[in-house]
């Protein structure tokens, strides 16, 4: 809990500092020179100033409210092994190559009880050697990993759909094939499902190579704000608006009635190729 509080404060300070730096950089490019001898121009400038002030004030209030809610967020205590439900971990993979094995190994290193953990690896019609690496993972952990080979690439939504259909657990956890989870991640994700009204839980996504350059650091700051603050604040009020595709958990009894509509979702008459995480979250809500 102390670590969460520290991360929340750290993320907030970084966001404030970043906003101040950006404002300082942009300030010279904005000049509001009010010439009251030109009524029309002065009215436009005044309107822009008022709108800008209102937008800045609204952003500040949003940030402060989010920070307060996130500060008071508390993680759900984890259960004893005997109380844990059966969990199905679904790993969809497309042209991920060797890294899918890293993902599978990280799942296998979980401290979740092995007799309550089902791993399903789905090859989404990859054109490289991803399927070979999935099979290698299954051979490395005999009887522990179920494999599904889709001959045609149908997209992540279709791969997850097929995994959900054969999952036998009470809870389904989705993990991207370019990610690695910590050993305690599944237990932490499953804990909130002790409350029957919970239909989905968002994982906490971080950048593993944030020390290797400027871009990873920027991504880490964005992820920190998104997960340590925004989603914590949303969880505090009981309504997370998007469970991230890289790591999330779902109550299968809540999503199974929604799956056909979800997998066949269209946008402007065409099949939806992205946004599967936000779509299923909205359906659950």
What is the role of each PLM region?
Residues 1-83:
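N-terminal membrane-anchoring/stem segments of glycan-assembly enzymes
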Residues 81-285:
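Non-transmembrane catalytic domains and loops of membrane-associated enzymes and transporters
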């Amino acid at each position: 809990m102390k670590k969460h509080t520290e991360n929340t404060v750290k993320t907030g300070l970084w966001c404030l500092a970043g906003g101040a730096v950006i404002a300082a950089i942009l300030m010279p490019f904005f000049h509001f020179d009010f010439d009251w001898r030109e009524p029309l121009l002065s009215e436009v400038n005044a309107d822009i100033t008022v709108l800008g002030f209102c937008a800045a004030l609204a952003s500040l209030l949003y940030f402060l409210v989010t920070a307060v809610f996130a500060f008071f967020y508390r993680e759900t205590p984890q259960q004893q092994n005997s109380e844990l439900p059966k969990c199905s971990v679904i790993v969809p993979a497309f042209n991920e190559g060797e890294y899918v094995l890293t993902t599978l190994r990280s799942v296998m290193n979980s401290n979740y009880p092995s007799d309550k953990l089902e791993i399903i690896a789905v090859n989404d019609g990859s054109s490289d050697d991803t399927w070979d690496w999935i099979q290698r993972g299954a051979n490395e952990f005999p009887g522990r990993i179920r494999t599904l080979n889709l001959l045609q690439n149908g997209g992540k939504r279709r791969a997850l759909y097929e995994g959900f259909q054969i999952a036998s657990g009470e809870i389904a956890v989705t993990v991207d094939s370019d990610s690695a989870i910590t050993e305690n991640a599944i237990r932490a994700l499953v804990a909130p499902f002790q409350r029957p009204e919970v239909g989905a839980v968002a994982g906490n996504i971080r950048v593993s190579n944030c020390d290797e350059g400027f871009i990873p650091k920027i991504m880490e700051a964005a992820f920190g704000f998104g997960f340590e603050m925004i989603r914590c604040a949303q969880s505090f009020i009981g309504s997370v608006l998007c469970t991230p595709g890289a790591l999330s958990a779902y109550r299968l009894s809540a999503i199974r009635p929604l799956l056909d509509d979800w997998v066949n979702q269209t946008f402007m008459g065409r099949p939806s190729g992205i946004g599967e995480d936000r779509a299923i979250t909205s359906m659950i809500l």
